[in-house]
Amino acid sequence: MECHRAGAEVFTGDATCRKKSVELLEELGLPKGLLPLEDIQEFGYNRDSGFIWLVQGKKVEHTFKKIMQKVSYDTKVTAFIENGKLRKITGIKTNAMMLWISINEVFVPEALPEKVTFKSSNGLSRTFDAAAFALGE
């Protein structure tokens, strides 16, 4: 993370970090409610490398109610972001059959912009309606 700090836009404070992270998700065609973090202390974005990071006060578990999917967000979430995609994600896990599985990629397929696909490091993937990840869901 430190190597991406140089030249990055860095924001602090929960309200500012939420606003900036949601704006970035929207700008790049990702659902605005994809990162429902709490007490965000820092948000950074290096436009040159595409690297983002969010630091929150404590680990958060969130259930996306429309799909009844529980997701855990660590105190530090990092990823490389590009149009319609988060890749090389750290700090996000989902609960499947009583196991926590790390998510390493999230993308919105160009051919199906109303869908969001999540991929794990072991090759498993699942696709959901993007509406399930609207802001406030």
Where do the language-model regions lie?
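Extracellular/luminal recognition modules and glycoprotein regions
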Residues: 1-51, 55-65
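Helix-rich interaction surfaces within compact, conserved domain-sized segments
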Residues: 69-137
